[in-house]
A protein has these predicted regions:
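Solvent-exposed, well-ordered amphipathic alpha-helical segments
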Residues: 18-21, 55, 113, 154
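N-terminal start-of-chain detector that recognizes signal peptides
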Residues: 2-3, 38-42, 104-105, 151-152
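Short helix-loop boundary/capping segments at the starts of domains
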Residues: 22, 57-61, 104
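Stable alpha-helical structural segments in soluble proteins, enriched in small hydrophobic residues
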Residues: 51, 55-59, 101, 151
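Gly/Thr-rich phosphate-binding beta-strand-loop-beta motif of the actin/hexokinase/Hsp70
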Residues: 1-34, 62-71
Length: 158
């Protein structure tokens, strides 16, 4: 059985949902103390880690694997259409679709995608791919990973 706790950290509250497999076991919504989050950014990762640890324990939510909703301000997202290509070609080309938005070198980002649809030609062969693509700084991911680790969780999903 896979156990995971989902976190949604907002401006004023933290929402937690604990799942065992596909079954929702427990939820909690706790108000954040003042000055924890501003403009979608956590002001002190250490203070947030301590809050999450105490909030989970107080709500009967175990310290286990974690999934985190990342604020829109921390991730670049795009809907893109590309010619049909292999996964290897896609991972090579994906960073170039964000070149006008990234503030750092492409090597400092994680890139991912989900296929929204495949457009086939008249013979039924893939012609184009419509993707939901995203990019996030590796340092941002590491900051969240370290925060959750300090709180007693293991980041598995962003």
């Amino acid at each position: 059985m896979n156990k995971i706790v989902g976190f949604d950290i907002g401006e004023n509250s933290v929402k937690m949902a604990y799942f065992v497999g596909r079954e929702l076991k427990r939820t909690a919504k706790l108000e954040l103390p003042d000055a924890m989050v501003s403009g979608g950014r956590i002001l002190s990762m250490d203070a947030m880690a301590d809050f999450l640890h105490d909030a989970a324990k107080g709500s009967g939510i175990p310290l286990t694997n974690a999934a985190l909703v990342v604020p829109a301000s921390e991730v670049y997202t795009r809907i893109i259409t590309l010619p049909a290509m292999t996964e290897q070609q896609l991972f090579y080309n994906l960073p170039y679709e964000f070149r006008d938005f990234l503030t750092e070198e492409k090597s400092k980002y994680f890139f991912d995608y989900a296929v929204r649809r495949i457009v086939n030609d008249e013979t039924g062969h893939p012609k184009e791919m419509e993707l939901f693509a995203c990019a996030i700084l590796k340092t941002t991911v590491e900051g969240y990973r370290a925060m959750l680790h300090r709180a007693g969780f293991r980041l598995r999903v962003l």
